[in-house]
Amino acid sequence: MSKSTTTYWNPLAPDQQTRWIPIKGLEGMAEEITLSIDPVTGEYTRLTRFLPGADTSAFGGKTHAYPEEVFIVSGRLYDHAFNRWLEAGEYASRPPGEHHGPFKTDVGCVVLEVSFPNRVAEESAPNGEECGPAQTS
């Protein structure tokens, strides 16, 4: 089986607001909408929306045993683990075990997440070397 598919639609459109689900424990601060999921592997793509003024400091940071990719779609989000503001357009490919958060936002933020919970083993490059951050010239 593979990840679910769908035709074009706009999850950010006003008429789609009822599809956003409050994140348990973060009600009033953050909500999510799953865009695609593989029921066998658990791999998923979702949007997480942090509402203006959200602050998850009381919950601490987190890590996952699996890799994930994040892209800041809109707004800005402060990641305490990295001591920096993430602005719209920023991207990260997090390795398993990377600490991130807690988060806060002043204006709100939408984050695209692609997560791979089935990939808990250390990933390696095709030549057997460990994967690292993308190299720039």
Identify what each model region corresponds to:
Residues 48-50, 71-77, 112:
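Short, well-ordered beta-strand segments in beta-rich or mixed alpha/beta enzyme
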Residues 28, 33-64, 83, 95-99:
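Conserved short histidine dyad/triad with adjacent acidic residue
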Residues 58-80:
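Glycine- and acidic-residue-biased ligand/ion/polar-headgroup-sensing regions
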Residues 1-44, 127-137:
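A short, N-terminal "cap"/entry segment at the start of jelly-roll beta-barrel domains
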